[in-house]
Amino acid sequence: MAKNISFTIKFWRQNGPKDAGHFDTHEMHDIPDDTSFLEMLDILNEELINEGKEPFVFDHDCRECICGMCSLYINGTPHGKTERGATTCQLYMRRFNDGDVITVEPWRSAAFPVIKDCMVDRNAFDKIIQAGGYTTIRTGQAQDANAILIPKEDADEAMDCASCIGCGACVAACKNGSAMLFVSSKVSQLALLPQGRVEAARRAKNMVMAMEELGFGNCTNTRACEAVCPKNETIANIARLNREFIKAKLAD
């Protein structure tokens, strides 16, 4: 049976990437514990507007754990302490206790500048994809499903890699602000398939170069990214990216 909880929420306020930020505090009362976290933020904004205050800005879209837009640092954890394989939108207030203090912050990364409050600019991920996360080969009309024989294990693993939604939790969790889990997942989803092998060397080099130029840090294998990934991507992808990159450089 659902119960109501009351708590204090501290949420980050910042007008832009070059402005100083601060925390605002608001008391929330009688919130049903079957309310989602984003629904709770909607209630917060209704209360702020009724008080004549500016609403709190945060990113969201599908609210179905698909799009990766809901990027919030909740009580020191990207997406909060959700079930394994879930984003902020799948976090429910039953995860919190009556009287808690809940702290909400944006992704903290030089490569993700703050647009306003907890909404950040993640165009850097798009630029990494533009650097090589695709195939340029003209394939014509759709082939028969069995025209190119691919082992089921490879197809399954490529699908797992492709499930990365680009939310940026890996970057937010990493002490170095590294995007290696994201980049390696996007490289792996193509490297595992014959259609992606033709441009594999160029793809690995260009995407790693773009990642470095955009201000992301280097990977030091702390595995924090793997622990918070809502789609359960693993550092096996990072190992594969390293192999692809080394092979590409040796072939130069």
Name each model-derived stretch:
Residues 53-54, 69, 73:
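Long, hydrophobic/aromatic-enriched structural stretches that serve as scaffold segments
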Residues 35-54, 102-252:
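Ferredoxin-type iron-sulfur electron-transfer modules in oxidoreductases and energy-metabolism complexes
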Residues 12, 29, 74-76:
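Short strand-turn-strand beta-turns centered on an Asx-Gly dipeptide
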Residues 24-36:
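Short, contiguous acidic and Ser/Thr-rich linear segments
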Residues 4-27:
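Eukaryote-biased recognition of intrinsically disordered, low-complexity regulatory segments
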Residues 57-69:
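Short, structured protein-protein interaction patches enriched in aromatics and acidic/basic residues
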Residues 74-97, 101-104:
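Glycine-rich phosphate/adenylate-binding loop and adjacent beta-alpha elements
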